Amino acid sequence: MQTTQSSCPGSPPDTEDGWEPILCRGEINFGGSGKKRGKFVKVPSSVAPSVLFELLLTEWHLPAPNLVVSLVGEERPLAMKSWLRDVLRKGLVKAAQSTGAWILTSALHVGLARHVGQAVRDHSLASTSTKIRVVAIGMASLDRILHRQLLDGVHQKEDTPIHYPADEGNIQGPLCPLDSNLSHFILVESGALGSGNDGLTELQLSLEKHISQQRTGYGGTSCIQIPVLCLLVNGDPNTLERISRAVEQAAPWLILAGSGGIADVLAALVSQPHLLVPQVAEKQFREKFPSECFSWEAIVHWTELLQNIAAHPHLLTVYDFEQEGSEDLDTVILKALVKACKSHSQEAQDYLDELKLAVAWDRVDIAKSEIFNGDVEWKSCDLEEVMTDALVSNKPDFVRLFVDSGADMAEFLTYGRLQQLYHSVSPKSLLFELLQRKHEEGRLTLAGLGAQQARELPIGLPAFSLHEVSRVLKDFLHDACRGFYQDGRRMEERGPPKRPAGQKWLPDLSRKSEDPWRDLFLWAVLQNRYEMATYFWAMGREGVAAALAACKIIKEMSHLEKEAEVARTMREAKYEQLALDLFSECYGNSEDRAFALLVRRNHSWSRTTCLHLATEADAKAFFAHDGVQAFLTKIWWGDMATGTPILRLLGAFTCPALIYTNLISFSEDAPQRMDLEDLQEPDSLDMEKSFLCSRGGQLEKLTEAPRAPGDLGPQAAFLLTRWRKFWGAPVTVFLGNVVMYFAFLFLFTYVLLVDFRPPPQGPSGSEVTLYFWVFTLVLEEIRQGFFTDEDTHLVKKFTLYVEDNWNKCDMVAIFLFIVGVTCRMVPSVFEAGRTVLAIDFMVFTLRLIHIFAIHKQLGPKIIIVERMMKDVFFFLFFLSVWLVAYGVTTQALLHPHDGRLEWIFRRVLYRPYLQIFGQIPLDEIDEARVNCSLHPLLLESSASCPNLYANWLVILLLVTFLLVTNVLLMNLLIAMFSYTFQVVQGNADMFWKFQRYHLIVEYHGRPALAPPFILLSHLSLVLKQVFRKEAQHKRQHLERDLPDPLDQKIITWETVQKENFLSTMEKRRRDSEGEVLRKTAHRVDLIAKYIGGLREQEKRIKCLESQANYCMLLLSSMTDTLAPGGTYSSSQNCGCRSQPASARDREYLESGLPPSDT
């Protein structure tokens, strides 16, 4: 049995704990089979509420409340209606669970509190989490508790819990047992006020007032005052005193109409203050309490209390669950709190706490209808705190609402606030782990600078800065996030000073973000918040690039978190689909602008193009789009007409003079040069088209000054232009490399088979030519590896070069060629050189497979072969297990005494492998066919005689081995190959288009001439670099900088297309079946509310009719009295009509109904 700490009023007054001198506390064990236990504290009615609240939080370790619901109702046995029982058992407990609320109720097992205790018990039994629990605190006066003597003796047994008998149904007069379903009890002792109930009420009011002045950080980074709501269910007339005093303390009340008792009295009279007279109140009390007899003095006193309560209509919310039961109780509670905060000032600050509460409860519908209904003018600065809460707690609907209501993200998002958002990352998330890793790396770097700096490092939880965020993004996006979250002044300087080791160039945290929507989008993507990220994507610019960047981030994070790889892959597909759909919208509107969108450098993503981002993200579906393929086809053919027959190209190869004939069709010449003033204002469609359709060097030629007339004649310009157009097209470069590579393989074959002479006769002339040819291949590989991108470090260039599998193949082929040539020059290892070169020829020949990628049918087969090789690699693990198991066993059975290593290797690995294909050595297994020798001289070169002792076991193992390998494992391999083929072949078109892009990009960047003539192209590149001439005209086909006016025009056009796409998506969502059903249900709710309003209007109209009828009756009586000749008649009828008239008058005053005419 668990012990407890108890203290009583005998302790010294200077105890450290604030409540020690005045509080007695302990534990209660309730009898019965449930083994329930609760904590209690005995307090005087004069105890400070702060001490009691501190005890609840500090000693009892209750979670700080986000809401306090004080339940007020009947403390006598009562019959509970079914709907009211559901409201208490389901609605109240659900609201407390979802909002983290405390329920203050009576501690006695009687009346309303009994049903609340049963609801708490049912929830505790059904809940599977210890973190989600309902906190119900029972408060009662000690004078009303049954078996009080057990509690009075708590100070005598400090270390043992009190055993309370399980007689919950035993009610002896005013005494009632404690409710065993509750876990915490506050028992109030009678004080100087005399009555225990008066002391209890005083303590309840003071505790509620104190809690309402405390603050909590629920739902975000800000603090709000803890809202306290009193819920009135049923109740007796004495409850009016508590309600009146509570509303004077500005405590909001929710009154459940239809629950009976004083709640129905308030529901009937509080909305009609003109009827709050003693006669009408007496009528209501008699109807609601028919078995009670009240004095006129009590009725008058209660009427005064009703008038005081009705004077605070903004604190009273009447709700009838029978007629308006479509809303949950937490919704009604939030509406009551919002209503209580409304004032005549209409200042936004008066609604902030309720708005924060709506954010914490995720009730955007209430925020729209009750707070953002047009009555309050919200400024952007008013919404900054709640915007932070909505972002941290992942409430995209609220973020959208705040932006629509006037929040300015450009003013809101400073670098300091962005850093604060990254500080709020969940410690269990992958992003937190990555940021912590980068933070630790930075601490180690700083610690290595010196002991003094190491002592200055912060201690405690890591406070991530934007430097760590930029490093994480750098790992995911590489060059696409270059310069993110760094000092802008440093980035703008030309040739900045070298940064000291460990020093961070961070932006000023008070500066506003340069692109707030992009930064918030990245923050949401890194936390895998798709809905939030989608909204930021919709609000930002450069949508295609942003979606592809998110696709890349999700792909990288899925590799780091294998458990959530499937979910992240689905998110990745969604982002890729966003980019694909938006580009489809753009391509359908304008092809030229869509092509420019693919190759323009995006300023928000470090001047990276959409094609580069798609390549990094491995977005195969994006490359398979018709618009992207049309652009690639345009790049592939260059300035030649698409669809030119290959034979004509080969004819131009053999006879270059055919280039200047009409054999091959070329595009029209570039437009005439224009003035710089015209280029700065590309407003006309013709000017824009000339920009978008211009290619590479032509764009620069548009801006060049006119040449001197004698520089080049028109004929020479025509010849030079045609020559460049033909030899500069990627298709020509590809065909040239294919033809020359076949020539290289033919020369290699000739040298190996015919003209490969040993020294000193060799090498021959053809072999020297082969050496020179390979030398030009080496130069081209060096150019591809180290001279492709000037803005990248050499190490990274080499890393990117090695990542390509075909480049690895080239490196192996060149390495083997160098080794083979070196060996063949030495006579002693000439044959070894021949062997290496023969193997190298096989590697060079396999390099031809790369050429097939351009073919639509053969291209996907390359991927199939590559994936099948991976399948074979894993299959070999299974096969090797059986090979080794069977080989070692048979070797031990047949040749136990043969220790020759070469023979052991043959029999353990080689022979079982051959047996898979049917080569079974019967001469070793069958005794009649054994052919061996036992002579020691012959044993060295021949097989040893097998041991036939376990011949039957060897045969059995052979049968088992063949069954498993030939039937089971081979069929497994075939099934794996079949699955791989189906997966790739099912998406063959997408895989081929993705391969086609890589091939086009590769040959687009290659020099025009093929090896060995490529040496001329390399010399030309070197000369252009020496004389500082632009040697990268072709790069502008895939990466282009547009003039600022045209660039802004493209950005605006893309934004418009994104809005069109989003409107189309929204229309599809509205037309979906689920949305139609939701709208129908919403309309039904509106109709129900409207009908409920009609009922209220009907009641008011009846009331007005009754008043009008009564006025007409009085006027008629006055007319009859004052009319001539009516005195006698009136006096004659005075005795018989005066009393009935008075009765009718009182009946009207009580019920509001007109008197009968009969």
From Swiss-Prot:
Disordered as annotated region, ranges: 488-507, 1127-1158
| Stated consequence of mutating H897N | Shows normal sensitivity to acid block and significant recovery from acid-enhanced inactivation
Phenotype upon knockout is: Mice show diminished behavioral and nerve responses to bitter, sweet and umami tastes. Glucose-induced insulin release from pancreatic islets isolated from Trpm5-deficient mice is significantly reduced, resulting in an impaired glucose tolerance in Trpm5-deficient mice.
Per its UniProt record, what Pfam families does this chain match? Ion_trans, LSDAT_euk, TRPM2
Its placement in the membrane is given as: Multi-pass membrane protein
- In this UniProt entry, the residues modified to Phosphoserine are S129
GO cellular component entries: dendrite; monoatomic ion channel complex; neuronal cell body; plasma membrane
Q: Where are the transmembrane segments?
A: 730-754, 765-784, 806-824, 832-854, 864-893, 951-985
Q: Which residues lie on this side of the membrane: Extracellular?
A: 755-764, 825-831, 894-902, 939-950
> Polar residues: which segments have biased composition?
1127-1141
* PTM note: Multiple phosphorylation sites regulate the Gq/ TRPM5 modulation axis, with the Ser-129 playing a substantial role in this positive modulation.
GO MF, one annotated term: identical protein binding
Lineage, top-rank taxon, reads Eukaryota
UniProt motif (Selectivity filter) ranges: 917-919
Q: According to its UniProt record, in which tissues is this protein expressed? A: Strongly expressed in liver, heart, testis, brain and kidney. Detected in fetal liver, kidney, spleen, brain, heart and lung, and in adult skin, eyes, spleen, stomach, small intestine, colon, lung, bladder, pancreas and thymus. Biallelically expressed at all stages and tissues examined. Also expressed in subsets of taste receptor cells of the tongue, in olfactory sensory neurons of the main olfactory epithelium and in the vomeronasal organ.
For this protein, the record's PANTHER family field holds: TRANSIENT RECEPTOR POTENTIAL CATION CHANNEL SUBFAMILY M MEMBER 5, TRANSIENT RECEPTOR POTENTIAL CATION CHANNEL, SUBFAMILY M, MEMBER 6
Q: What does this protein do?
A: Monovalent cation-selective ion channel activated by intracellular Ca(2+) in a voltage- and temperature-dependent manner. Mediates the transport of Na(+), K(+) and Cs(+) ions equally well. Activated directly by increase in intracellular Ca(2+), but is impermeable to it. The activation mechanism of TRPM5 involves a multistep process.
Indicate what this protein is called per its UniProt record.
Answer: Transient receptor potential cation channel subfamily M member 5
Recorded source organism is Mus musculus (Mouse)
